[in-house]
Amino acid sequence: MVVEDDRSKDMCPICKTDKYLSPNMNFLINPECYHKICESCVDRIFSLGPAPCPYPKCGKILRKNKFKKQIFDDLGIEKEIDIRKRVSGIYNKTEEDFDDLKDYNKYLESVENIIFNLNNGIDIEETESNLVKYENEHKIEILEKNMRESQKNSDLAKYQEAMARLKQEKVKIQKQMEIEDLEFQKQQKQELLDKLSTAQSANSEELITQSNNNILKRSSLRKRQLQQLTSQLDQQFQSSNPFSKQAKAIEDEDNRTPFTPFKGDRELHKNYTFLPDIHKNDAMDVDEDAGLNTYHAPYLSKLAKDKQYLGAGWRLNNAFERALDEAFTGLCCFIDKEKT
């Protein structure tokens, strides 16, 4: 792979055409060697069939149908992405295919070793032979796995399309209700004007108030109707879509069996208690009433009398509680037990 400098980045190394003079020029690369060639040179050199790479000292046989547009500026990243796509298409097992997590981790490690060797040119022939051998031995399993994944992707695409239609239906209902509300307001306004033209001046305020109340009642009623309609649409969507049912079942299962290494963000039943006087009294009174049932910390006691610390919200109990938390947190944490 050739390292490019900034000056030759926008110039074809074969025909020396510059992108400044030809703004529509596109560069193509071939996964065989990842040398950058402009599109016109590819058409000129490889239209009649396979030909060697025009780069000096390369000589790899390239085919026109293998050329593609460069996506990443760094060709090293481009090469690694292509290798990962190829290897993941062959080693396409997931965690569901393994009974033990350790076996799955070993499988992932072996896949990463293959990618690393191919990307860095380490034992290329041996790695390629092992890759081809595995593909030939597990061809049926690979095809079955690809079919299952394509089915999942198809279900996901259908689910996304249904979600889009659901949103469109909600927007359509909302717009229709807004149009009807505007028509109702115009009708109320016209009726109010007709009544005011024939009513006495004493009754005009009552008519205006009554009209405003009717509009408010109508608005609140329409909001409730809109909420009911949207909830009905959501229920119909959830009941008719199998993908959403599966996602909801997985979510419910995750909610039923939570796992956190420290039992959540707090312990409801702590393994320690404050001494009675410290727990009840304020931080300023702890040291004055210190006795047998208290714990006296000379340094912290001085800070408890400092107005600068107290003004910032610091309290002596907070310091004691933090020290005890650091001492006791995690002592009763058994990860294997929590997982089960």
Curated annotation (Swiss-Prot):
Transmembrane segments: none
Compartments, record wording: Nucleus
A GO term, aspect molecular function: zinc ion binding
CDD domains cross-referenced by the UniProt entry: RING-HC_TFB3-like
Primary residence: nucleus
Residue ranges the record marks as coiled coil: 124-206
UniProt KW keywords: Coiled coil, Metal-binding, Nucleus, Transcription, Transcription regulation, Zinc, Zinc-finger
Highest taxon of source: Eukaryota
ZnF RING-type span: 12-57
Cited Pfam families: MAT1, zf-C3HC4_5
GO terms under biological process: nucleotide-excision repair; regulation of transcription by RNA polymerase II
Assigned GO CC terms: transcription factor TFIIK complex
Role played: Acts as a component of the general transcription and DNA repair factor IIH (TFIIH or factor B), which is essential for both basal and activated transcription, and is involved in nucleotide excision repair (NER) of damaged DNA. TFIIH as CTD kinase activity and DNA-dependent ATPase activity, and is essential for polymerase II transcription.
Name of the protein in its database record: RNA polymerase II transcription factor B subunit 3
